[in-house]
From Swiss-Prot:
It catalyses: cytosine + H2O + H(+) = uracil + NH4(+). Its cofactor is Zn(2+). Pathway: Pyrimidine metabolism; UMP biosynthesis via salvage pathway; uracil from cytosine: step 1/1. Catalyzes the hydrolytic deamination of cytosine to uracil or 5-methylcytosine to thymine. Is involved in the pyrimidine salvage pathway, which allows the cell to utilize cytosine for pyrimidine nucleotide synthesis. One of its GO terms (cellular component) is nucleus. This is Probable cytosine deaminase. Pfam families: dCMP_cyt_deam_1 (PF00383). Substrate binds at D159. Zn(2+) binds at H59, C87, C90. Homodimer.
C-alpha cells in the first residue's frame, strides 16, 4: 500500500477507472480500464482493454495514451487512473506520454494470483513502481488502493466464468 492518502476526488476517479474495467468485461474484453484526468479535473480520455480483438498492445493504458496523444501533448499535469497496476508495456507508454502521476487499484502481485492458471494473461514479475522509478523524469506512482473494489471485475473472469 502506498503511504500517500488519496483524496475523495482521487478515489472517485479511481472508481471511474474500475467502472471502465467492468464495461470492458461486459463487452467480452479483459477487465482492465483507465481514465486520464487533466489539471482542471476534466476526464479527457477513457479506455478499456481490447486485447481479445487481436492486437496484444491494446491494453487500457496504451489505448488511452495512444488516443489522447494524437490530439494533445501537454500531459505533464494530468493523472492516469487505472483499475489495475500497469504492466511494463503500459508503464512505458505512461513514461513516453509525459504523464507525471499514475494511481492504480489492484496490484500486479494480486493480479498474478488471479491470472496465472488461465494462461491468457502471462505475468511479468516486475511492478510499475520499479519501471517508472527508473524514468529520466519523476513520475508519481500511487497504489494499490481500494483493491477490494478493483478486484470485482476480475472475479470469476480468469477461471472461465466470463
Amino acid at each position: 500500500m502506498s503511504s500517500t492518502e488519496l483524496s475523495e476526488k482521487d478515489l472517485a476517479y479511481l472508481r471511474e477507472a474500475i467502472k471502465v474495467s467492468q464495461q470492458a468485461r461486459d463487452e467480452g474484453q479483459h477487465p482492465f480500464g483507465c481514465i486520464i484526468v487533466d489539471e482542471n479535473d476534466n476526464v479527457i480520455m477513457s479506455a478499456g482493454n481490447r486485447v481479445p480483438d487481436g492486437d496484444v498492445t491494446q491494453h487500457a493504458e496504451t489505448r488511452a495514451v495512444g488516443l489522447i496523444t494524437k490530439t494533445r501533448r501537454d500531459l505533464e499535469k494530468c493523472t492516469l487512473y487505472t483499475s489495475t497496476e500497469p504492466c511494463a508495456m503500459c508503464s512505458g507508454a505512461i513514461f513516453w506520454s509525459g504523464i507525471r502521476r499514475m494511481i492504480f487499484g489492484l496490484s500486479n502481485e494480486n493480479l498474478i494470483k488471479l491470472t496465472q492458471k488461465s494462461g491468457e494473461c502471462p505475468p511479468l514479475y516486475i511492478n510499475s513502481r520499479d519501471i517508472l522509478g527508473a524514468a529520466s523524469h519523476p513520475i508519481e506512482v500511487v497504489g494499490p488502493y481500494i483493491e477490494d473494489e478493483a478486484i470485482i471485475p476480475h472475479k470469476g473472469f480468469w477461471d472461465g466464468g466470463r
